Each structure stands twice: as C-alpha cells, then as structure tokens.
Swiss-Prot record:
High-level lineage: Eukaryota, Fungi, Dikarya, Ascomycota, Saccharomycotina
Family note: Belongs to the AIM39 family.
UniProt GO cellular component terms: mitochondrial membrane
Keywords assigned by UniProt, alphabetized: Membrane, Mitochondrion, Transit peptide, Transmembrane, Transmembrane helix
Stated name of the protein: Altered inheritance of mitochondria protein 39, mitochondrial
Primary localization class, coarse: mitochondrion
UniProt-annotated location(s): Mitochondrion membrane
Organism (species): Kluyveromyces lactis (strain ATCC 8585 / CBS 2359 / DSM 70799 / NBRC 1267 / NRRL Y-1140 / WM37)
Record membrane topology: Single-pass membrane protein
Transit peptide region: 1-30
TM ranges: 86-106
C-alpha cells in the first residue's frame, strides 16, 4: 500500500517538475523527498522508519529486545488459542450435527423408528417412580423389616442386658418404626438421554407406555422425552462367551460351584419396559432404611433389600455415651460379599 502510493506520488512529482521547473524549487523548500532518497533520509543517509498510519507510536518508550520477544510470544499464544477454539468449535458442531442428523433426520423422520440420543451418565440411586411404587407394598415391607430387625435385637446379648426381654422402650412401649424410606438401585450403569420417536407412532396395545411416560410434541416433526438406557455389561459378556463357545454355567461352576446360574437376576422385581424405560428388563434392586427409637439416647437403624421377602443387610445401634455418639454394629450380612 505504501509503496504503491509512493509510486503514484513520485510519478506526479516528475510530471510537475518537467512541466514547471519552479515546482522543484518549491518542493525542496517544503522539505519534500527527492528522487534519490525515497527510503532514506537525505541528511543522515539512514533508512526511514515505515509509516504508522494505523498504529499508536510513542517515541518516548524504548522497547528492549526481551519486551519485543515477549510480545511476539504472547501474540503467537493468543493466535494458537484462537485456532484451537475454532477447531474444537468446528469439531463439536460437526459431532452434534452428525448425531442429530442420523438420530432425528434419518431414523425418526425417514425410517420412522424410535431413537435415543445419549447425554450424561445417569444416577445409580433414585426414588421409586409412581408406577413402580404401585407394584411394591411399602407397608408390608415396613412391617417385615421391623420384624427382622426386632429378631436381630432380641438375639443380641448387649441388647438383652441393657434393654431386657421382651424388648421395650424406656417408656414401656413396644418399639415402632419411626422413619422408613425406600429407594431403587440400578444393577447396570445407565445413560440419561433424549428419546425421540415419530409423531405418528402409537402403542395402543401398551397402556402403561402412555401412562408412565410424558411425551413432548414438536408439531409436524416428532415427539421426545427424557429416558435412561441401561448398559448391560453382563449380557454383553455372556454374548461374548457364547461367541467363543464358552457357556456361562460352566464358568460359574469354575468360579463358585455353590452359585446357581441366573440367581442374581431374580433378586429384583421391578421394571418391564422398552429399551429406554419401556420392552427389555431394566434390572433394579429395592432398598429400604428404617429407624427405631429405644430411648432418648439410643436408636436402632436398619438397612436391607426387598424382593419377595425382606433381607437385612445391616443393623446398627446408635447410642449417646459421655456426650459422644457411638455406633455399635449389631448385624452385618457378609454372604453377598463372599458370593460376589
């Protein structure tokens, strides 16, 4: 830009100097650069500094070589960060575009199939859903849990010595369950995501599918909801063993001869649904936790599983002694750890 403008400016000077010799004298008086010193100073014969039309120049500040090197390094780093940001933004946009294009445009809109878009890992522990809570008799679970807990207490020597037999509270009443909570634990890890299906998809023969899931509709396109897809590691492992010609039963006989094939799967009673909470099994365990007050300074807490019957996992006595809360483990089930 500077050289181009300089060339035009020089040609104009030559024309004017030829047409009017007085212009040469006038230009010299106005300290104009002659034709032999375009890039040098005629007084010192040194190279002129480049023009700084768009730069802020402070002649009072003299930058050292280290400052210049640091400024160049910072400029290179800033440029590298910008390139990385652009690269990752483009890569993320591409991944999202391909995922949405395949899951929604191809599978849902074109193939008219249900699709699942994974987002984040799902929680392993969660509350009972409204549908699952109807299938579990919580009052019966509470009563059975209390009976199993009282059986452990009455057979424990320390409880007999401190509270006597039959077991009663400090007010002379029969111990009762003060607090009782129930929750679920997924057997397999899962992924939380978005379930998308065609807008004209219907399941008239499956009333539970409509009753337990709340779908959101985008008019003219599709329906979507949040769902969880289990990652069945055990099934994949069994499929791999069958592929190489090894039977799961033979493997269990080698690892633990006392364990029956498939006994673990009968521990959970819940959940029959599709692959995203709806035709395959999503294995769950029901856990419960209860509290029983024995006195103002003593409380029993118990925890266990429930399937057809109650199975206690641990019973503890929490007691206040010398202004300190002490925990006594009265019962702990070690069978699952030995068999696992």
């Amino acid at each position: 830009m500077y050289l181009a403008r300089s060339g035009v400016f020089i040609s104009r000077i030559r024309v004017l100097s030829i047409l009017n010799p007085r212009f040469v004298l006038l230009s010299r008086r106005l300290n104009h650069t002659d034709s032999k010193h375009y890039f040098t100073d005629p007084k010192t014969n040194e190279i002129k500094k480049p023009p700084t039309f768009f730069q802020h120049h402070d002649s009072k500040v003299n930058a050292s070589a280290d400052d210049v090197a640091q400024a160049i390094a910072e400029s290179v780093r800033a440029h590298k960060k910008r390139r990385q940001k652009v690269f990752f933004s483009a890569m993320l946009t591409g991944i999202i575009g391909v995922t949405l294009g395949f899951s929604i445009s191809y599978k849902v809109l074109y193939k008219k199939q249900e699709s699942f878009i994974p987002l984040v890992p799902s929680r392993k522990w969660h509350r009972l859903s409204a549908y699952d809570a109807q299938r579990v008799n919580i009052d019966e679970m509470k009563m059975l849990g209390k009976m199993r807990c009282l059986s452990v207490l009455t057979n424990h020597e320390m409880i007999r010595e401190q509270f006597g037999i039959p077991l009663k509270t400090d007010t002379g009443e029969v111990p009762s369950v003060k607090s009782f909570e129930v929750w679920c634990e997924d057997q397999d890890p899962g992924v939380l995501g978005i379930v998308v299906r065609p807008i004209d998809a219907t399941r008239d023969n499956d009333s539970r599918y409509h009753r337990t899931h709340g779908w959101h509709t985008i008019p003219g396109l599709f329906q979507w909801r949040m769902g969880t897809k289990p990652i069945k590691i055990r099934d994949k492992f069994d499929s791999f063993l069958k592929f190489i010609g090894v039977n799961t039963g033979d493997l269990l006989e080698v690892i633990n001869p006392d364990r029956e094939v498939g006994d673990f799967k009968y521990e959970y009673p819940l959940r029959k649904g599709d692959s995203f909470d709806g035709d395959d099994d999503r294995a769950m365990h029901i856990w419960f936790f209860g509290e029983i007050d024995l006195s103002q300074d003593a409380m029993v807490v118990f925890k266990g599983k429930y399937h057809v019957n109650v199975k206690l996992e641990q019973v503890d006595l929490l007691k206040k002694e010398n202004d300190q809360l002490i925990r006594y483990v009265l019962y702990k089930n070690e069978n699952d750890k030995k068999n696992g």
